Amino acid sequence: MKRRACAAAIAAAGLLAGCAWFRPPKKASFWEGRIAIKDPGDPQNNMSASFELQGNASAGSFGLFNMLGLTLASMRWGEGFAELQSGGETHTFKSADAMVRSSLGHSVPLAAVFGWLNGSDANVPGWEVDRSRYAERRLRARKTAASESGVDQAGLELLLVWDAP
């Protein structure tokens, strides 16, 4: 009887210790793949590139590369700074969103992109997200309303295809 009680106590302790070590998987903080932006109002503003995105909306980096792997733009941001390196020049911005706008030529909701890549259902006013192919690591976001500045028109599409982590 004592043996059973002792064995049960050891088994219970083992289970509790096992639970203490279990940690749910963290959301990804690094993605690489392809990005495309389609502007139906001005096809000359369409763009496509490979990308590497790391971090989160508060601090991170975003690199764009041509089909030969050469760097088109390298962006970094953190608390109080946003920096874009492109064409041998470095530019600073007040926000990561302004930096991304300058680099891509379009306003893209950076904070939402991190959420979308992590599978979040985050809704952004003026954007409609198609998550139907998320399991295939494909995402399409479409601008449903023109920006207040008038720079981005409704119909602009952001397409992301990323590799498995």
Labelled PLM ranges:
Residues 21, 91-96, 101-165:
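Mature, soluble, non-transmembrane domains
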Residues 11-14:
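Bacterial N-terminal signal peptides
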Residues 28-32, 57-61, 134-141:
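Short, hydrophobic/aromatic-rich segments at coil-to-beta transitions
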Residues 35-39, 62-65, 139-150:
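Short beta-strand segments that buttress and anchor functional surface loops
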Residues 59-109:
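An acidic-aromatic
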Residues 36-74:
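Post-signal-peptide N-terminal segment of Sec-exported extracytoplasmic proteins
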Residues 17-34:
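Bacterial Sec signal peptide processing site at the extreme N-terminus
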Residues 2-8:
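N-terminal export leaders
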